[in-house]
Curated annotation (Swiss-Prot):
SUPFAM superfamilies cross-referenced by the UniProt entry: ATP synthase (F1-ATPase), gamma subunit
Subcellular location field: Cellular thylakoid membrane
Gene name of the encoded protein: atpG
Family label: Belongs to the ATPase gamma chain family.
Cellular component, GO annotation: plasma membrane-derived thylakoid membrane; proton-transporting ATP synthase complex
PANTHER family listed in its UniProt record: ATP SYNTHASE GAMMA CHAIN (PTHR11693), ATP SYNTHASE GAMMA CHAIN, CHLOROPLASTIC (PTHR11693:SF41)
Keywords: ATP synthesis, CF(1), Hydrogen ion transport, Ion transport, Membrane, Thylakoid, Transport
Role this protein plays: Produces ATP from ADP in the presence of a proton gradient across the membrane. The gamma chain is believed to be important in regulating ATPase activity and the flow of protons through the CF(0) complex.
Protein name (record): ATP synthase gamma chain
Topology class, membrane: Peripheral membrane protein
Amino acid sequence: MANLKEIRDRIVSVKNTRKITEAMRLVAAAKVRRAQDQVLKSRPFADKLARVLENIQSRVQFEAVDSPLLSKREVKSISLVCITADRGLCGGYNTNIIKKVEIRYAELVKQGFQPNLILVGKKAIGFFQNRKDRYVIKSTFKELEQVPTVKDSEGITNEILAEFLSENSDRVEIIYTKFITLVSCAPVVQTLLPLDPQGIAEENDEIFRLTTKDSKLLVEKSNIEKSDSEKLPSDIVFEQSPDQLLDSLLPLYLQNQVLRALQESAASELACRMTAMNNASDNAKELASTLNLTYNKARQAAITQEILEVVGGSVV
């Protein structure tokens, strides 16, 4: 039987670890709420921008507009934007997104391309920089805000635009983690450039809200549908030409897409960390209970042994 002091020390250590994991779970929950608030705050701008672009689209055919962000040219080179976290302790979040990038990269190589990587997050940077002989890294971004802001998306968007407009890349794809629920998220691949006119003004969108029910954290998701009141009046007169308007608005739309990917990734990371820390807390509780049982058995055995020795000594 193990030494009583060793078991007692182990119990104290496990209980202290549980306090840490529980605190990390609560911190992650609070940050999910902040991420939710950030999404809601950015929603009005994104909605109005989509309405303006829809209004322009209703008047002119985007295909007839000479905008470099809409031009589809022969694809000779491709850039992949990969979004991971700066930190670990979030379950399989980073591993899953890196695997998705590896799979997509291998697919493009088989098609005869040599993709460039634009890496966001220390985990992706560390992983792919250790494999420079297999991957081409164009640029890196790290230490972004845990609740992404427009400033965070600006630098990434500028890098993407520079790659596409200079024709170093003919297509830009972004690989990020889509937030589904607190216990479910999935890596997805989305084409950023060239922009698709049909996908610029979506009919429906989703937002998430973190709520509580019976002392448990839950996520409510709802569709945001366009209403007639949100549509811009049809008699609005634009002073600039469609080309000028789109040259100004499309980069904003692209930046909003990047920001959305960052926000979804951040929410997914925090949700995965909540789940991981919750599981760690449950495991610590179970381990502490098992150790307590072992300690009590060891203590009982020691007391029994002492009694037997005393009884044996008195008989002698």
